[in-house]
Amino acid sequence: MTPISERPIRIGIVAGEASGDLLGAGLMQEIKALYPQATFEGIGGERMLKEGFNTFFQMERLSIMGLVEVLGRLPELLAMRRRIVDHFTATPPDLFLGIDSPDFTIGIELKLRQAGIKTAHYVSPSVWAWRQNRVFKIAKAVDLMLTLLPFEARFYREHNVPVKFVGHPLAEIIPLHPDKVAMRHELGIDASGEVIAVLPGSRGGEVSRLGPTFIETIAWLHQRRPDVRFVIPAANQARKTQIEQQLQSHGGRLPVTLIDQHSRECMMAADAILLASGTATLEAMLVKRPMVVAYKLATLSYWIMRRLLKAKYISLPNLLADKALVPELIQNDATPAKLGEALLKELNVERRRSLEDEFEGLHKLIRQNASVAAAQAVAELIEKGRVATHDAREGH
């Protein structure tokens, strides 16, 4: 991209987790192409630091899972937020950008915007799915929302929030036509025969709820299709131990290969995928594999969620297509027999071909060169701010 200006602009950024660090680093690269003298400060991770970011706190201090953990660390988190707000209010940047972590960043954006600072937010919270009234706070907090998915942008337009759909970075990383045979070779899996990848989730709670059901599904399928093999990627050592314990009930009789991490590679090597709802469903779509999506919560949590949930679907392929492309089996429907039957249908060759075409279309839809699109949108916002400030000074 051609530089817009040589003036030294300053951008405040807060990213709270690894995915935000990755997005932040990509965005910084493209902003520096437009503003070679740009400087960046706030909270960021290793990748952003490599791009010259000045972080006030270690990003890991924001990466907290679960309500109980958040409550335990609340005083520290509030102090960090206050320090960020005070710093940028005292020395206003050209723009402040929150990346994901909405419970932490949107409060900062609101206070800074009230102080007259231009603000943007990168990665929409799931307001379109539940707690939709959050959109009214977001409308007050940001001058611009940058979304990874097109249906999110539609939701903001309906609520008159300035928005730009920039595409999803995963759609650029994952090739349009992944090579199944090469991936099997890389993972040491036999090139012949059918393989199902099984992904019960990356968090302990998910694996506790879905792991036993998924393993019983493997047993159900093995009885009916003894030729099919299974591969389970474990997100980390704790998940691997958990899955190994769950497999013990079958005494090593199931044709299962446990692999450390490499979940995307396992999906590429498979003919079909059984997985928990979440970002993994988007990856499964991008590697063009048929899938069966399962979702299970504790009974009370599910009861609450059912009443709050506004979206028609839970999996990203269905939300993107706005139709039931892939089967979703939720709560009491997620039984070994129902999951097994759905997987057998997904292994059908004709079914696979038609899904591949659908998935390729969706892949192209969200492959927009996200970092470049986001940087251009941010630059437009900065330049608009400059014109407005100049006009105010000139008394126009």
UniProtKB/Swiss-Prot annotation:
Xref: InterPro entries: Glyco_trans_19 (IPR003835)
EC number: 2.4.1.182
An example molecular function term from Gene Ontology annotations: phospholipid binding
Pathway: Bacterial outer membrane biogenesis; LPS lipid A biosynthesis
One cellular component (GO) term of this entry: membrane
Keywords: Glycosyltransferase, Lipid A biosynthesis, Lipid biosynthesis, Lipid metabolism, Transferase
Known catalytic reactions: a lipid X + a UDP-2-N,3-O-bis[(3R)-3-hydroxyacyl]-alpha-D-glucosamine = a lipid A disaccharide + UDP + H(+)
Family statement drawn from the similarity comment of this UniProt entry: Belongs to the LpxB family.
Entry function: Condensation of UDP-2,3-diacylglucosamine and 2,3-diacylglucosamine-1-phosphate to form lipid A disaccharide, a precursor of lipid A, a phosphorylated glycolipid that anchors the lipopolysaccharide to the outer membrane of the cell.
Record protein name field: Lipid-A-disaccharide synthase
